[in-house]
């Protein structure tokens, strides 16, 4: 599940981040985005799309991800702001907030889905990314827990 990250690591990049969000489905509640960076080649076998994991497994992996990741950022946009700007803009805002919370500046960002408004770093949009990228899958777990 590191093939996409490997593409950038093999070009000499060290800090490849994955972003995913949770909370776009509920009628009420915040949208939460997470951004995760792993050390080159650092693989966690059990990581996969958070929707395919039990609550117990997500909680276990949450702790492992925080322990092993070089950086984890979380962005939250609350209901009042969602009502003000709409869910799509709120999702993009949460993504950008999560990047701003990282302790390490990414050199490239993998975003789950076909589009985003992330402009400060180079981006690859990965449809179904939480099944294809460990960094995105880890972000989906962090955002969901």
What are these model-derived regions, one by one?
Residues 1-145:
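RNase H-like, Mg2+-dependent phosphodiesterase core
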């Amino acid at each position: 599940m590191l093939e996409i990250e490997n593409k950038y690591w093999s070009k000499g990049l060290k800090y490849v981040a994955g972003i995913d969000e949770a909370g776009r489905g509920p009628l009420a509640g915040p949208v939460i985005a997470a951004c995760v960076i792993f050390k080159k080649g650092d693989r966690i076998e059990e990581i996969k799309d958070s929707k395919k994991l039990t609550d117990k497994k997500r909680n276990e992996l949450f702790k492992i991800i925080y322990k092993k990741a070089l950086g984890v950022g979380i962005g939250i946009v609350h209901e009042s702001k969602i009502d003000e700007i709409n869910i799509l803009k709120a999702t993009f805002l949460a993504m950008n907030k999560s990047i701003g919370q990282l302790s390490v500046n990414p050199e490239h960002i993998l975003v789950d889905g076909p589009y985003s408004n992330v402009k400060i770093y180079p981006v690859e949009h990965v449809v179904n990314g939480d099944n294809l990228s460990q960094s995105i899958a880890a972000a989906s777990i962090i955002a969901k827990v």
